[in-house]
Regions:
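A conserved ligand/cofactor-binding region detector
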Residues: 1-427
Length: 427
């Protein structure tokens, strides 16, 4: 188990070596309990581990508080722990939701970072080489506080200097940006962040202070450059907010987009200032899927057909599937392929009838949009198109129109009203 601390304040004293020692005091603590799931590799003899965390109170029911009539305080620790893991990504349209979401993020991150460092030290002697064995891939901005948490662990628990901890951290952390939408580039109010994570905020302040100095040194004598505008766009702490995307870029060795065009937009528009300062950090990693999950497992009829024509090497070496090109004009292969497609549509039609009570024609075109519901994903545009087609057919029943079944699958964030209304419209 790991102990995760929230709130309180940070005291500073000097040890016998003249080093400043930072201690978090007056905090609330939660115990993180690990649960491991085996992730079995495909025919390679490798089993990886997915570790998840449950939250438990450090102190359970406080009888003294209960006997004094303070019933809320008696169960305070239990409620704190339970709330953290009750609902992932709670509605953050209000202050309490924002606070719970930040607690949630830090809880999982702190437990995981502590475990990663301890696990490394069980097998290695030199913490300075941590980055040679460990990488923290920050999947969007939600886990970015891991940067400051790793700095905290290295400095406060392993007594490294700032410079030593910073070198390790910047060689350990890498950031994946998934979207250019400003709303997804997470920001936290300073008041909330500093109150909930006082030691972490101190570290973020120092990262920001040093980075702002770097900006000033780099651009102060460059003609035509507005240094204050650079700071406004690039600072980690600015205008009362902690900007997590900025911290992820400043504090890691890699920043990647998930499609070629997306990465180009990051470099030339959205993160242009950072790209100019750190061009070597930016790269592209195009999103993809695994053929073992989405073909071999999900579509066994088609998988068997592919194997019958090109062998089974494609299961572990996807480019081998390109050998199907020679069958592109083969009438027999085309018919086999279409038969498999039809059988799968019949299977889906049965599922829809069983679970939704709707009868669909498997001979119709299945027009499918399954992804999280968001205005930029354009489900609204899609359903408006459906409504337009319906009206056209009502007005012109003589139109030559091939039957089409529209299938939507999505969920909306709890506080996202427009997305909820779009679901209502589709229904």
């Amino acid at each position: 188990a790991k102990i995760v601390k929230f709130g309180g304040y940070v005291s500073v004293h000097t040890d016998e070596n003249g080093r400043n020692v930072f201690t978090q005091e007056g905090y609330q603590s939660v115990k993180a309990i690990p649960f491991d799931f085996p992730i079995v590799g495909y025919g390679n003899g490798i089993v990886n581990t997915l570790r998840i965390w449950d939250a438990e109170p450090v102190e359970c029911f406080q009888l003294d508080s209960f006997d004094k009539g303070d019933y809320q305080k008696a169960v305070e620790q239990e409620n704190l722990a339970r709330n953290i893991v009750e609902v992932l990504y709670p509605n953050d349209n209000h202050y309490a939701g924002k606070e719970l979401r930040l607690k949630q993020q830090y809880f999982f991150i702190s437990a995981s970072v502590q475990e990663a460092v301890e696990k490394y030290m069980r097998k290695h002697d030199d913490i300075h080489k941590f980055y040679e064995k460990v990488t923290f891939q920050l999947n969007d901005t939600h886990p970015t506080v891991a940067i400051a948490e790793l700095m905290r662990v290295l400095m406060d628990d392993y007594y490294l200097t700032w410079e030593e901890a910073w070198e390790i951290t910047t060689k350990t952390c890498a950031y994946t940006n998934h979207t250019i939408m400003a709303e997804a580039l997470e920001k936290w109010p300073i008041e909330l962040f500093s109150r909930l994570l006082p030691r972490i905020y101190q570290i973020v302040e120092e990262i920001n202070r040093r980075f702002v100095l770097d900006i000033q040194q780099k651009y102060s004598n460059v003609p035509g450059v507005d240094v204050q505008e650079k700071i406004r766009k690039m600072a980690i702490i600015y205008d009362g907010q902690v900007k997590m995307a900025n911290m992820a870029i400043v504090s890691g060795y890699s920043v990647n987009g998930v499609a070629r065009l997306h990465t180009e937009i990051l470099e030339k528009q959205e993160l242009k200032d950072f790209y100019e300062m750190f061009p070597e950090r930016f790269n592209n990693k195009t999103n993809g899927i695994t053929q073992r999950r989405f073909l071999l497992h999900a579509n066994p009829l088609l998988a068997d057909w592919v194997t019958a024509h090109v062998g089974d090497d494609w299961i572990t070496d996807l480019p081998q599937i390109s050998r199907l090109k020679v069958y592109a004009d083969d009438k027999k292969a085309q018919q086999e392929f279409m038969n498999i497609k039809y059988q799968n549509k019949v299977r889906l039609a049965k599922y829809i009838l069983e679970h939704n009570g709707i009868e669909v024609d498997p001979r119709s075109i299945f027009d499918v949009q399954v992804k999280r519901l968001h205005e930029y994903k354009r489900q609204l545009l899609n359903i408006l198109h459906v409504m337009h087609l319906y009206n056209e057919l009502k007005e012109h029943p003589e139109l030559d129109f091939y039957p089409r079944t529209f299938i939507f699958g999505a969920k909306a964030a709890a506080g996202y009203r427009n997305a909820k209304l779009t679901i209502k419209l589709i229904n």
